[in-house]
Amino acid sequence: MNKFYYFNLALFISISFLLIFTLLSALNLIQSNEAAYLIGEASRWCERVSGGLFREPINTLSNLGFMLVGLYMFWVLSNDENNSSNPFIGVNKISILYASVVIYLGPGSMLMHGTNTEWGAWADNLSMIMYIILPWLFNIYSMSKWTISQFLYTYISIVVIYSIWRWFTDFELGINFNLFGVSIGLWVISEALYRYWSPVFRFIAGFAGFLVLMLFGTMPNEVIENFNEFWWVILFWLPGILSNQQPKYSRTYKWFFLGMISYLSAFAIWLTGVPDHASCSPDSIIQAHGIWHLLTAISTYFFFIHFRSIKTI
């Protein structure tokens, strides 16, 4: 098989999506007619809603960043030797999954910003979930007796169940459960476990989730006082329960922190990309939400390098 087979396949699928998406948009077959009255108004993410090709042109096209970064990952993987024990070096099921999910972050978000439809919002949210659950599941896989098949089955099961549940409810699944937000905590917890694994730390690591909550503005006393809303904090101990083996490798954490800095910077900018913020300029070609897309795309690459950086302990 040509070593660039998967890169070429990903490139073909990406270009095909862009062509079909643009054609359907040009024919006005996928935009929301119910929300047509919003044309000319500032969208939820500040940019003025357009009656043209895409409802939010800048917020739509900025998602090309995800597709380009994901394609570059495929290029890097295609040039690797395939004899590495690291699943993020060379072409294999896990590396293909990661790069593919990064690419899909682009189309998922395009479908929302380009159409302003409920199903587009569902596709966008699903793409985010498909990405964010992957790192912490991979970390658990790396600290357990899971086989690759078990890892993939678990990942696919979560995605399928979530996609159906989310379709019929909302982004909190009707039970005050934001899987995307919780997964950020689970990722940080699993990274702490990977770095400092010990039998005792397996049960301490869950508290790191509260540091993540504090970083995003939720204090521990709020969790205690409103436990019916924050019941999901019990999941912070899931990585420790499942990670029953010390990892065989170490990682270079500078790439993880660069990824986090990029993501948190993007999040800070994301907060300004709303109509009632003083910096909102609906007609500007520089949109805060577009910058959010580009910076988070960069963060996925930093995390990619992070997972590629393992060394034998």
Question: What residues fall within each predicted segment?
Answer:
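Early transmembrane hairpin module of multi-pass membrane proteins
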Residues: N2-V233, Q245-F257, I261-T312
